[in-house]
Amino acid sequence: MTGKITTLLFDLDGTLINTNELIIKTFQVTLQEFLPDRVFTREDILPFIGPSLMETFREINPAHADEMRAFYREYNLKHHDDLILEYDGVYEAIRALYEEDYKLGIVSTKMYDTIMRGLKVTGLDKFFQVVIGLDQVSNAKPDPEGIEMALSLLNATKEEAIMIGDNYHDIEAGKNAETLTAGVAWAIKGPEHLAQFQPDFMLEKMSDLLAIVRDEE
């Protein structure tokens, strides 16, 4: 493969695997535990999807942010395998990219072990050469550190890479790292939300990536 795009970096949650209901349920339980006098609707929780847990909890309840994060992670791991879902066509598209020798990596705001658990449950783990979790970087997305680390480990340059994600943190991180960017229309916040951050591409389905990388050759 000698095309312009050789390297594809993906967010995990809401992009490769559908963890939306797991995340929302975990936030609901955590918030009820620590802030029982406040009511958080589903719509209230949607903005929490994407940022790191500490960023969210420090904004909501700074005095108990560490405790909330620990409670969240414990509940999330306990219910992880039962509540995550696969997106149609993702496995097939990632397998096709892998079989065509594209370099594939993940850059997520989740911890490495939790990323790997989700990948193994969905069978995607065998396709990714590099996985960067929050515990491997000093600065979470939209800082470009994770993307730059992944590119270095993959021996790839920003000019030949694209960052794919479902949240503005992913698009902004890609722009900050000076890669191409793609949003996913199946993002829980909707394609209109992502479009305002001007990704280079908007994927209606994951297989759209195959056409994009082939067109760049």
UniProtKB/Swiss-Prot annotation:
What's the top EC group for this one? hydrolase
Please give the biological process terms from Gene Ontology that the record holds.
DNA repair
What the entry lists under Pfam families is as follows:
HAD_2
SUPFAM superfamilies listed in its UniProt record: HAD-like (SSF56784)
Alphabetized UniProt keyword annotations: Hydrolase, Magnesium
MF annotations from Gene Ontology: inorganic diphosphate phosphatase activity; magnesium ion binding; phosphoglycolate phosphatase activity
* Coiled-coil portions: none
Q: Which coenzyme or cofactor does it need?
A: Mg(2+)
Q: Do you know which NCBIfam families this protein is assigned to? A: HAD-SF-IA-v1 (TIGR01549), PRK13288.1 (NF009804)
Q: What does this protein do?
A: Hydrolyzes pyrophosphate formed during P-Ser-HPr dephosphorylation by HPrK/P. Might play a role in controlling the intracellular pyrophosphate pool.
Q: Which PANTHER family match?
A: PHOSPHOGLYCOLATE PHOSPHATASE, PYROPHOSPHATASE PPAX
Record protein name field: Pyrophosphatase PpaX
Species, as recorded: Listeria monocytogenes serovar 1/2a (strain ATCC BAA-679 / EGD-e)
Taxonomic lineage from the root: Bacteria, Bacillati, Bacillota, Bacilli, Bacillales
